[in-house]
Amino acid sequence: MDPDKQDALNSIENSIYRTAFKLQSVQTLCQLDLIDSSLIQQVLLRPSFWEARKHSLSVQQLSQALQELFQKAREENPGQVHPRAPELTLSLLTTMYNSKGTGFLQLMPAAAALITLSGDSPLSKYRALFQLYAENSRGGYDSGPRMTRRVLRKLLTDLQQIPTFVGESRALCPVESATRSCFQGVLSPAIKEEKFLSWVQSEPPILLWLPTCHRLSAAERVTHPARCTLCRTFPITGLRYRCLKCLNFDICQMCFLSGLHSKSHQKSHPVIEHCIQMSAMQNTKLLFRTLRNNLLQGRCRKKEAARRQQLLDQVNPKGVPHHAQARLLKKQLNQYKDKLQAIYTSQEERICRFETRIHKLKTNQDSLWTKLQQIRRDLQARLQPPGPSSSSFQNVGNKVDHSSTEKVPKGGDYLQIKNATEDASTGEPLPKLDEVDRSHRSHTNAEHALRNPESPETTLHSTRAQSQTQKMPQKVISALPSYQEGLKQDIPKMVPAEMSSPALAAVEKKEAGNIKERKDELEEEELQELLSKLMDAFNLETPSGPESSVNMDLYSGAQRVCRAFSALVDQIALPNLK
């Protein structure tokens, strides 16, 4: 493009007209205005290319397709197609969709750019674009080509590369906002061709440059029988603008795009654009409309404010800040979600640790409960009175007392016991030695108890007295064999019969005296030892508590046994001491 012409186009204030004029210059340079959309579909969308529409085309394949396309255009318009048109068009498409220089281009974006810059009407272009991008829904009641949100988003993204090529990407609105405006009020996931055509014909801001470019091309050679009020040019060529507030105020294309105005006409006044010549009836209607706006200025101001607000909404749609706010909220929600997930994970770990501790505590509680039950059974077994009841102990005590009183030896009995001992010294065994020993001990205890009625043995514990009374006869019995052995050792050997009777009598008398002395000494020592053992066995502390009153019968029985043994020992020991 000529730099001077490019600078002139950059001086246009309105971004939509500036973009449209630049694209019109590119269209004219590449001679794409000589090609219609049907020819493009015939060449680029044939079966060989259409099967690979989702894949990439090499630059050589696209160059051959463009050569064929312009060859057919040359046949329809002989002498108008420049030989370098295919080369310039290939360079244009490569710059738009192959910026990385890979050598491959997508078929659908290239075809969409050719259709958009073709010389067809906007309605034909919209239909061709819908057929190019729509997806066929198979089966169902409403089968046919449909366009989903994803497909519409891809179409608008591909078309945005066209104004970006001429450096006018800032004048476009976001793709997401345009997609929401198209699907506003639509409940289905896809739209049909009628809905798509009605939306694009409403001239959305993202595609506003496309119909403007078509109007510029259509009005390029049109003349209007009117004079420009600002530059006084007659006739007006190209677009004609007429003020709806100033009476008979016409503006040419150059003055309008340059932003010129007069004292009576301001930039804020509403104007109407004409790309074709107006008839007399249209001029009359426009005159009455101007008069109404001047007479009803309040109504005119309201309509102008509404029109300007509508234009502002189109240029700066409300969905943009809402969309940004929604994205911010979504980001914050994701952050909160991550935090809550981390908190939930930590709480789960704590719960697992608590459950493990609770399980351990339950196990310890069960083991402690088992131990307590065992201790309880042991205590019950220990607290229960062992052996027979107290009544049986009372009977045993009465029997022992009766037997001790009956078996107390008197003077003659003591001589009998002494004679029995002497008989045992001659070599004969002692008859019923255990019974005699038991009778001696019971008699001795009885006499000792009578002489010492306030002895400490009166407060013996039942269970310990019982055990000591059971062990006492065993001690006495164990001592008797040693006593018998001593007696047997003291028995002298039999003297021979050859000794004389006087000498034998003297010897026997002497030996009998010695034997008697030894026997008395041994008996005294044995009895004293038995007495000391018996006193040690019954030297116990008296228990205190409620059990003492319960076991008094057992204590009394033990006391009687102690008295009987003491009396028996005294009865045996006192004659020897004398």
From Swiss-Prot:
One of its GO terms (cellular component) is plasma membrane. Residues 399-410, 431-451 have a biased composition (Basic and acidic residues). Zn(2+) 1 binds at C228, C231, C252, C255. The keyword Zinc applies. It is found in: Cell membrane. It comes from the Eukaryota. One of its GO terms (molecular function) is zinc ion binding. Residues 382-475 are annotated as: Disordered. The keyword Metal-binding applies. Keywords: Cell membrane, Coiled coil, Membrane, Metal-binding, Zinc, Zinc-finger. One of its GO terms (biological process) is synaptic signaling. InterPro entries: EF-hand-dom_pair, EF-hand_dom_typ1, EF-hand_dom_typ2, KCMF1/Dystrophin, Znf_ZZ, Znf_ZZ_sf. Residues 455-472 have a biased composition (Polar residues). PANTHER family: DYSTROTELIN (PTHR12268:SF18), E3 UBIQUITIN-PROTEIN LIGASE KCMF1 (PTHR12268). This is Dystrotelin.
